[in-house]
Amino acid sequence: MASSINGRKPSEIFKAQALLYKHIYAFIDSMSLKWAVEMNIPNIIQNHGKPISLSNLVSILQVPSSKIGNVRRLMRYLAHNGFFEIITKEEESYALTVASELLVRGSDLCLAPMVECVLDPTLSGSYHELKKWIYEEDLTLFGVTLGSGFWDFLDKNPEYNTSFNDAMASDSKLINLALRDCDFVFDGLESIVDVGGGTGTTAKIICETFPKLKCIVFDRPQVVENLSGSNNLTYVGGDMFTSIPNADAVLLKYILHNWTDKDCLRILKKCKEAVTNDGKRGKVTIIDMVIDEKKDENQVTQIKLLMDVNMACLNGKERNEEEWKKLFIEAGFQHYKISPLTGFLSLIEIYP
């Protein structure tokens, strides 16, 4: 008699095995993508001007002849995952897809820095210590593996800090693409402060689109100290937990998900002070995820839940609408409005 688990049919068991193997080896998804970026393959295909044959690709890569078959295997797998298209005519060739177009260095929208930053062993390697982290009372995952909090680690490691800032800037460019169609966010404003605005990628887009709007990029002093502004763009260094420059509006893009509810309340209260000084009643605009497992498509939910686990390792979290609402009320805001922004991000406007 065939063995079974709890009376399961063999077909169910084998389906479960396939699911397990898919996730056991899922690291190859990330590492093969990292390989393509490190080998500059998207740019090679882009510069070729047409689908590139395997023989031309390995010639440009200058790989040993013994590894040509391995290059083909990796390209076949990446194509299966949607990063390249295989064209079969006289010789197997590879073309870019929308996904790999986002990895072409030098293009307006390039996420290659994000691939390099997140998949650097410094960051990705920390996830081998999830078990140890779970039993530590107060430490974040990176506190366990790096010996300090993530932000302290960035301050002490300029090279990785640059990589992180480049990654955040590359991601901001995609968000900015969506913001161009959100004129209503900036209507009637004379000033806005981008809290945690990094090197100013988002603020520059806002300034170009709304030249009469005064933009302030507010970030840690070491991030902005060597940056120069323009007519309607200025950089200010400081601590968002202490005070935030006054403005008609505050922008928090990918900020609150980094922090605990307690810390978010501190930030939101400082934001409220910044937009209500001098009798004004401005607003706070948040760009972040809103988890909705009932309404979202499965793939969107998976991304949001994946990011929630990722943020948990920083002591942050992704939130559903009820969790957001609770924060806003406790911080003293009266009402809010949520609008879809991109495939998995929302634009939240809150008013004191």
Swiss-Prot record:
What reaction does this enzyme carry out catalytically?
Answer: a 7-hydroxyisoflavone + S-adenosyl-L-methionine = a 7-methoxyisoflavone + S-adenosyl-L-homocysteine + H(+)
* List of catalytic residues: H257
> Which residues are listed for substrate binding in this entry?
V118, L119, D120, P121, T122, L123, S124, G125, S126, Y127
Instruction: Summarize where S-adenosyl-L-methionine binds, as residue positions.
Output: G196, D219, D239, M240, K253
Query: MF terms per GO, please?
Result: isoflavone 7-O-methyltransferase activity; protein dimerization activity
What's the stated role of this polypeptide? Transfers a methyl group to 7-hydroxyls of the isoflavones daidzein, genistein and 6,7,4'-trihydroxyisoflavone. Can also methylate (+)6a-hydroxymaackiain with lower efficiency.
Asked if the keyword Ribosomal protein belongs to this entry, the reply reads: no
Name the record gives this protein:
Isoflavone-7-O-methyltransferase 6
Q: Which Pfam families match?
A: Dimerisation (PF08100), Methyltransf_2 (PF00891)
What interactions and quaternary structure are annotated? Homodimer.
| The protein's annotated pathway | Phytoalexin biosynthesis; medicarpin biosynthesis
Q: Which cysteines are joined by disulfide bonds?
A: none
Among the GO biological process terms of this entry, one is:
methylation
What Enzyme Commission number(s) appear in the record?
Answer: 2.1.1.150
Q: Which UniProt keywords apply?
A: Methyltransferase, S-adenosyl-L-methionine, Transferase
**Family membership:** Belongs to the class I-like SAM-binding methyltransferase superfamily. Cation-independent O-methyltransferase family. COMT subfamily.
